[in-house]
């Protein structure tokens, strides 16, 4: 079975296909010029332990946004008309329905990155992306862009797994973009919606035994494990699940049987959506797993990677899917399906 993990997908998009030369016909009307008084200074990181600061004297007007978290979070803040290029979304059908109209107005949209020359011609004043975006082999470093009067913001959760990934990182991401775009109230509203969703679930299930939850991704004949230090695991912990974890990055079939999870969340990337049912069937038909509670009670659910890896606004989807999967009595409508 082919596994398109986030790393492989990044390599496919960013290296295998390579940045491409593009011509952008910008038919957007010029967004309003908004001065920021006082100026806003935001800290971001090139890598763990290597911070850099960006100062904004006005709301950015020509934004190049890489990956779904950047594009959709900026749209959710009400500033989609400031995006001149949105890269990294395979198909508009993966965009939240309420964001598609704004997404459609972005002048340049593609799964592939435009090359450096093309991005320079877009004259951006802000670039938002992941750590992998801003290297000498890709779209250059933050220093390169700051020398050209353009700021860079890198999602902290894309820096790597040297430390735990948490919901608080995503709240900071949304809050930082809210400050950059002078949309602080909107950012807090989005964050509060997520926090209230968690608080409601926790309050309503306070007297229940924590369900044992397993977060996995299929890797050939093995399972990659998403434990406490991953965002998926952090969501589970925050919702008072008993999250299965080990000292290794994978979990064997034998260990799954021994742990006997009540619910399994099957993580799939957008590159795997067309094979999602095949992947699910692979798990459901494993002879050794037939006695596991999650399979016996039909509690194996898809969890899209976009909701648990540097998700930004899509963290709400991750919270909803996990809470519905953990507590079916509280949410009898079933687990949201973002894949089909």
Feature-to-residue mapping (PLM):
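Second-shell loop/turn segments in exported
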Residues: 54, 60-61, 128-132, 157-164, ...
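A short, structured surface patch at a secondary-structure boundary
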Residues: 64-122, 126, 130-132, 244
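Alpha-helical, coiled-coil/dimerization segments enriched in small aliphatic residues
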Residues: 89-92, 224-250
